[in-house]
Amino acid sequence: MRILRGSPALSEFRVNKLLTACREQQLPVTGIYAEFMHFADLKAELNPQELEKLEKLLTYGPTIQEHEPQGLLLLVTPRPGTISPWSSKATDIAHNCGLHGIKRLERGTAYYVEAETALTAAQIATLEALLHDRMMEVVFAELTDAQQLFSVAEPAPMSQVDVLAGGRRALEEANVSLGLALAEDEIDYLVESFTKLGRNPNDIELMMFAQANSEHCRHKIFNADWTIDGVKQDKSLFKMIKNTFEQTPDYVLSAYKDNAAVMTGSTVGRFFPDPESRQYTYHHEDAHILMKVETHNHPTAISPWPGASTGSGGEIRDEGATGIGGKPKAGLVGFTTSNLRIPGFEQPWESDFGKPSRIVNALDIMLEGPLGGAAFNNEFGRPNLLGYFRTYEEKVTSHAGEEVRGYHKPIMIAGGMGNIRAEHIQKKEIPVGAKLIVLGGPAMNIGLGGGAASSMASGQSAEDLDFASVQRENPEMERRCQEVIDRCWQLGDKNPIAFIHDVGAGGISNALPELVNDGDRGGKFQLRNVPNDEPGMSPLEIWCNESQERYVLAVAAEDMPLFDAICQRERAPYAVVGEATEERHLTLEDSHFANTPIDMPMDILLGKPPKMHREASTLKVSSPALERSGIELNEAVDRVLRLPAVAEKTFLITIGDRSVTGLVARDQMVGPWQVPVANCAVTAASFDSYHGEAMSMGERTPVALLDFGASARLAVGEAITNIAATDIGELKRIKLSANWMSPAGHPGEDAGLYEAVKAVGEELCPALGITIPVGKDSMSMKTKWQENGEQKEVTSPLSLIITAFARVEDIRKTVTPQLRTDLGETSLILIDLGNGQNRLGATALAQVYKQLGDKPADVDNAAQLKGFFDAVQTLVRNDKLVAYHDKGDGGLLVTLAEMAFAGHCGIKANIETLGDDALAALFNEELGAVVQVKNDELNAVLATLAAHGLEACAHVIGEVEASDRLLITCGEEVLIERSRTELRTIWAEMTHKMQALRDNSACADQEFAAKQDNRDPGLNAKLTYDVQADVAAPYIAKGVRPKMAILREQGVNSHVEMAAAFDRAGFDAVDVHMSDILTGQTVLDAYQGLVACGGFSYGDVLGAGEGWAKSILFNAQAREQFEQFFQRKDTFSLGVCNGCQMLSNLRDLIPGAELWPRFVRNESDRFEARFSLVEVQKSPSLFFSEMAGSRMPIAVSHGEGRVEVRDAQHLAAIEQSGTVAIRFVDNFGQPTQAYPSNPNGSPNAITGLTTQDGRVTIMMPHPERVFRTVANSWHPDNWGENGAWMRMFQNARKYFG
């Protein structure tokens, strides 16, 4: 083993955060210095040239002042016996650079700790807990201890459970020790089954059975028979859900039988490379819509980042594994937790009811979990466009006195939508002899028993089992697997995939049997063929672990050469682990121990284990009405605006890429001031049409504490009012995912669950004509623990989270909450579907005064809700609405405030027609919406509402004004007169506090200050050219299309939209993978243009873009090709984002690029996804010809975009050379260092450069994602089909003549 020191690992502000954490733990630590340590496991000693190459390879990241280490060494490394994702990617890069003497690279972090006094063993243990993640890392005291990273353990054997001699008792003991969560009748079933087979079960067989038959996988409660209050019910919960499909099967193409549901989409030109020529082209066909929403609650409670990350990853795999290959497109995440209690910002309603030590508190869940979910989506390359966040934790009256209801076991929702070809919706037959394949990453000893663990209430399984059941993420691997799936479905009827499932709960022990069972086959498997990064694992651990980023497939033997070629090109690992058999029998052979760990008929595993029967009793609790004597109106406004369910959530949004794919038409951020208040998410179905897809969410979980049915109905209703202002058409076009969370078995909750499912499945949805073709349930929403000898528990309310999905006819019609003051006189109309009842039970108002109230809002009239949707659709289609915002948490007051924030304007409202109870009128959460309409169309709008039966509930309540005030009166009485800026500041406090705790606090402070600037003119565009003119048109007309290499490396994710932009500009865009160049299949001589695309090549291991660049620089064949290409005078090149970082590292090969800087970690120390204003500079860049002086917004999505120069002279030389191509500017048009206008902190606001001759340009922002006007988060009204950035690509075509 060779040890190589790396660069410092922590920025100054990260060190300060760590020192603060030490102080909070009363540790006498005075200083911490951390640096990366690299460990190389060698086949043979490296020669001097190889060593120099390796040292260069391991020099990456921002330049931070190095120290000579001193103090106590704590070396944090991955767990011995595991191979980290960093290791596998860094080793790949080393091999691609020709360093074949390296067996493996691994990385650790060496912390050198100085203290006032020598640390005790207990203090060191406390410090270690701050420095490492005990689930995947260890702490060593010496650098040489890292040798253990490369030691190979001997495989552990399996064990048996002696049922034949020990009977039921032996299995009961195994049930506890292995954490199987088997029910009593399942234990009986297994004892009987193995007694009949005349042999003892192996531990691996029991774990496999437990996973496959866990509540998590089998949904026993939803399939159970029910007796309620002594009356036998004639339908199961699942049957009531399926009733929605029986009543309204319209537009549903697949339901209840696959990894995701499928609905009818649009006929459009799908843009992807031709499988033969690899040239990108449009394929006119149906792009049907797939949809899925998952939960990952248990792992997120234990370890929030990996819990939420693998939750998103698993849901993405569900979409990819639909039919025989789907394409994930856009994602959502949601969180419900107990109270945040932000230090120094604790709110009056936030009591502390304690928690068990093994789960994370709500604050840490929300500081870490969202980053995990965002990071996976970002690296995979899926925009995250939707979400919600609610907190609830309160003592409420129950049938047995008082109890604490809340979310110590959080809800973590991960969902999304994608597209699928018509001929791929149904899975094919699995031929006998078909190869059974595991595609993706290796097995690791993580996530053991996840399915069974998440089926238990938190606290029922031993703490080490809880930690064993959390998985680890590697999104770049999942991206590679999806590229394989994409190449397969793009082959159309030649798609080699016969059957595919994702690997989720229970690992391959669940996925492989499910695969062959669903194909009506058996399987013969070889355990030692399973790719395995931990040789010491037992057969149970290899078979049942939940290592992520894996799929199982059946591929006919004759299709294997094609499948193999695809995997080789995409560098996606796979292994043939078995063959499909005619006989429905499961055999697993272990060549190492020469035995058969599994040998059982399929029917024992997946036959008919005993069906559950639930007995339930209805328990209704009366709750007192809201006590209002202590409520002052203006204080109520402030409290409600600070409640997390209401407050601004920017800290959850800008961490997630919202522009990747170039198909995003509506993200969370609305208008020129980018305020996060969008009602729903909208995507374009293709680059060549205005058809699209929309998704929205609805949830009102606290209402279930008063009325189970009302809570469920409101969730459906809110999802509808959120999505209503997109151009959908008829209501039955909307399809729902229903995610049910319940503390099953808690007194009254089972009957409540039945009531809620019946309310939606048997009553409301059939009445609306809406189908629920997909969903998920989590039935163990309770946390129990002992504290000072006292038994404590926190129980979640019944929680239904609804996600609505719909096809969109015209994405340009979507109406946002942004109020406009530049369209003449306008009025505001409230459409009140509560019909003046103004019920205050379980509202935000009640919560912030630590109350529940009595009567909640409800959907009393399904026909009226349908009339509302139809009316809004008519108004949207006829362009009658200026702005639209649904009424939700916080009521009318919050709806009006958020519309004013989005429009940066004032509101004058009079609520006298809403009854004589102003508090109830302003804070009730009955369904409805506020719309802004032009006064000359007011009567027509009111007539449309009346025609749909809404005359009595439509109230003209006010007008919009160009001011900084929110004025609400009741007749002559002034109720509220506040500065909009002041309210906007209160609304932003939570997001500021969370950002300051999590990110660079100086950046958080700057952003908070910027929101308080009432003079801010917002985003704007000032162009020096005609956006409608196409300067490439004359050259396109000649019929000559120059060839453009759309270059990607593993982990790149922005290549398709890049190809679409160049295709539109008149180029033949060709898909070129780095593996094509390294294997000599492609030569760059054939191309006139080259573009290096954005994403996360090698998962940003060895620095963003640096690993990709070094695999070129240190590979003789690749280096020669690129060098020759750059030397040719008839070529041009572009690098965007990751491609910009990569090309900047090739500066030695590019003429005129000598002064280019490096691009390193953002100032905020966070991935930044913004819609930022830039100005084009005067430069030689051919891309920006005649664009100098233009100012317009552009998509920014990166974690490492800060320009780093050697010194002030280097920066001055760059400026003097005239090669700066674009700069960030503030909304006043001035180059800026201020965050977030300058989202990465680059000096002189530089974010794009070119060469002296202008033929090569690099830039961090993404013009390819916003080349269409509809893909811009905000744009001027007068732009046509092409957005301002299309000119860049047209200029490139013009350059070739």
UniProtKB/Swiss-Prot annotation:
Pathway assigned in UniProt: Purine metabolism; IMP biosynthesis via de novo pathway; 5-amino-1-(5-phospho-D-ribosyl)imidazole from N(2)-formyl-N(1)-(5-phospho-D-ribosyl)glycinamide: step 1/2
Organism superkingdom: Bacteria
UniProt-annotated binding residues for ATP: 307-318, 678
Keywords (A to Z) from UniProt: ATP-binding, Cytoplasm, Glutamine amidotransferase, Ligase, Magnesium, Metal-binding, Nucleotide-binding, Purine biosynthesis
Any single biological process term in GO: purine nucleotide biosynthetic process
EC numbers for this chain: 6.3.5.3
Localization terms from the record: Cytoplasm
Catalytic residues of the enzyme: 1137, 1262, 1264
Catalytic activity: N(2)-formyl-N(1)-(5-phospho-beta-D-ribosyl)glycinamide + L-glutamine + ATP + H2O = 2-formamido-N(1)-(5-O-phospho-beta-D-ribosyl)acetamidine + L-glutamate + ADP + phosphate + H(+)
Gene Ontology molecular function: ATP binding; metal ion binding; phosphoribosylformylglycinamidine synthase activity
Record-linked CDD domains: GATase1_FGAR_AT (cd01740), PurL_repeat1 (cd02203)
Residues bound to Mg(2+): 718, 722, 886
Transmembrane segments: none
Domain Glutamine amidotransferase type-1: 1044-1297
SMART domains attached to this UniProt entry: GATase_5
GO CC list: cytoplasm
Top enzyme class: ligase
InterPro entries: Class_I_gatase-like, FGAR-AT_N, FGAR-AT_PurM_N-like, PurL_large, PurL_linker, PurM-like_C_dom, PurM-like_C_sf, PurM-like_N_sf
Protein function: Phosphoribosylformylglycinamidine synthase involved in the purines biosynthetic pathway. Catalyzes the ATP-dependent conversion of formylglycinamide ribonucleotide (FGAR) and glutamine to yield formylglycinamidine ribonucleotide (FGAM) and glutamate.
Subunit structure: Monomer.
Entry's family note: In the N-terminal section; belongs to the FGAMS family.
Listed NCBIfam families: FGAM_synt, PRK05297.1
Record's protein name: Phosphoribosylformylglycinamidine synthase
Organism: Vibrio cholerae serotype O1 (strain ATCC 39315 / El Tor Inaba N16961)
